[in-house]
Amino acid sequence: MEHVVPLSRTSRLARGGLLATAVLSMLVSVQPASAAAAPDGRRESHPITDAGGRNLSLNGTASLITWNTGRRLIQLTSAGFQQMGSAWSTERVGLDRSFETSFKVFLHSSEHGADGIAFLFQGEGPRALGGWGGGLGLRGIEKSVAVAFDTYQNTDDPNSNHLAVILAGNPDQHLATATPSIPLFGKPFLARISYNADEHRLRVYVRGLYPRAVEKLMLDENVDVAQTAGAQQGWVGFTGSTGDLVSRQDVYDWTVDAPKA
């Protein structure tokens, strides 16, 4: 399990900057082996942030934290009650094109907390932020497709350790759910999301961050991302929330392989 100590935070809002290529890579400049380069050379990995946190729009309780190793992470919630935060790349990507992203997640507090985070494709803009608690920070972001990593069992949830595909900003209805064999809370894990635009196929994989861990396919669903998000070009990023139970909800080593809009 990775262990790092936070040193400093940036300001709550960090915006601006342009991407020089068609690929976004957040917090680390190494491309995962699973994301193959396109033959036309439009896909190339590079950092989308610097020490000032440009190229990110941070909303609500989201902030950018620097660890003692120099690594930066997005903290969506800081273990306060009824928090919600979102973080978006400020550069749009083609939602009607094939896409892959990977990132590490650490959801933690002194006791089992809530509520979880989500990765979104959305067409509403870099200031989008939804509701707290079971809203996962995405409730009301209607032009969106979300993959949720949920650590609290609300009324319509199967359990307190599940993944879900959520459409149109409504976390009370799931297109699909799955229960991973690893805990989503208390230990960091790796997630990978792949979208095949030709087949409208969304796949979600998870893997623990321990020796000999194996990546597992958890969700494999048909969804037209561009149609559901209401736009051929849109934003990608994260939301997260807490309610009466709390959690520190961190995302790091975020890499995106997608055509620039």
Where on the chain are the PLM-derived regions?
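Polar, low-complexity loop segments and adjacent catalytic/binding residues used for recognizing
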Residues: 36-261
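Secretory targeting and sorting signals
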Residues: 2-37
